[in-house]
Amino acid sequence: MEVANGSSAAQGQNGSSEGSNGYKLKFCTVCASNNNRSMEAHLRLSQADYPVISFGTGSLVRLPGPTITQPNVYHFNKTSYDSMFKELESKDARLYKNNGILNMLNRNRGVKWGPERWQDWQVGVPRLQHAKDRGSEGTEGGLVDIVITCEERCWDAVVDDLMNRGSPLNRPVHVINVEIKDNHEEAAVGGQGILDLANSLNAAAREERDAVGASAFDNGSASSRATFDERVPDILASWQERWPNLPATWTVAWF
């Protein structure tokens, strides 16, 4: 059967194949406004019991308005998804229901409180105030293993920001861009693809963790994860064959 974008190949891959005791990599998903693409992926990964956090790289949160020149603008870290939902519902419920914004915000407010900005993230600082977020279990320490962005400019922003931070923790992190168009339909497909990639990466990480020992692997040092790091390009290449319409870019950066 022909698969146009990998969706058939990935159906049923919800993380359960790893088993309840399977090792789980920690993920971070990133888009521009932490509303559509990164939140779809955040939800998908959390439903598969992956530890996951999410961010946006924009200066402000921008959502479509009545015209292209009249976006709805909000501040990161200060505005909840619930307040956005209620404001837009009161402004024009019919418009924002028909364009999918209310449905998106309703989903988001069931995942976490509100959009967070990548550049404001204090890596390694405990995220105890996010205990109610979906996917929060395992991310309490403020560290992740894999960052997945959903647009090239977001990937650039993340990589540049990490370089500017100067690697204070000397801890490697894989930064992968999965190019996803910013609409609800493509975000849904992209979320499936990201979950498929997470499953493949996690399977390899579990094997390498078993080989080097849990304590050493979980320490996160470059030496203890070298064999896993070496496998990532091949894993990504195999995944790209399954998802040809989601172009990917990859690099190793440092926290």
From Swiss-Prot:
Q: What is its main location?
A: nucleus
Q: List where in the cell it is found.
A: Nucleus
Q: What GO MF terms are annotated?
A: protein serine/threonine phosphatase activity
Q: Which residues form a coiled coil?
A: none
Domain of life, source organism: Eukaryota
Q: Which reaction does it catalyse?
A: O-phospho-L-seryl-[protein] + H2O = L-seryl-[protein] + phosphate; O-phospho-L-threonyl-[protein] + H2O = L-threonyl-[protein] + phosphate
One Pfam family of this protein, by short name?
Answer: Ssu72
- State the GO CC annotations: nucleus
GO biological process terms on file:
mRNA processing
What the entry lists under InterPro entries is as follows:
RNA_pol_II_suA
Q: Does the keyword Hydrolase apply?
A: yes
Keywords, A to Z, come to:
Hydrolase, mRNA processing, Nucleus, Protein phosphatase
Listed EC numbers: 3.1.3.16
The family annotation for this protein states: Belongs to the SSU72 phosphatase family.
Q: Tell me how this protein assembles.
A: Component of the cleavage and polyadenylation factor (CPF) complex.
Q: What does this protein do, in the record's words?
A: Component of the cleavage and polyadenylation factor (CPF) complex, which plays a key role in polyadenylation-dependent pre-mRNA 3'-end formation and cooperates with cleavage factors including the CFIA complex and NAB4/CFIB. SSU72 is required for 3'-end formation of snoRNAs.
The identity of this protein, by name, is RNA polymerase II subunit A C-terminal domain phosphatase SSU72
Q: Which species is this record about?
A: Gibberella zeae (strain ATCC MYA-4620 / CBS 123657 / FGSC 9075 / NRRL 31084 / PH-1) (Wheat head blight fungus)
